[in-house]
């Protein structure tokens, strides 16, 4: 598989979410491509989470985060991974029904993925506050962070599937009659 790698880094005391099927030992030391630092509560002086950041070049494109609104390139916006049931899905909404904490970074000399196995609130500031910087904040700081590297976006996606397992696709007939409780206008 060439240069494909998955590295795991553990912070705090994470909850086992069963999101990962490939059990890897946690590495220690510096995280490649990311800077990690604690988030300090200004009132108490105690740690209240962890912040990861990396610099971005103008050409960098950011993909991922699953069920979030806006276009394919997530750059220039802020997203919150915290499941909410929003009736009106407009572009100013930061989170939806599901949290998918996978971000793919593609740019000149840059190609990697970040996956946070964190059931808590995670904020992704992807060049919203500063155009040249991405900042990811885990509110509780208890998580497993995975760095995925490969020679192409397809290879990184393949590594992610190896990490989290293959999705089950039921046969078409298994869906039966599907009905929504919402009303939809004829379009």
Model-inferred region functions:
Residues 1-172, 180-182:
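Catalytic and substrate-binding clefts that recognize carbohydrates or anionic sugar/phosphate headgroups
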Residues 177:
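Conserved, well-structured core segments
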Residues 185-187:
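Short, acidic/polar
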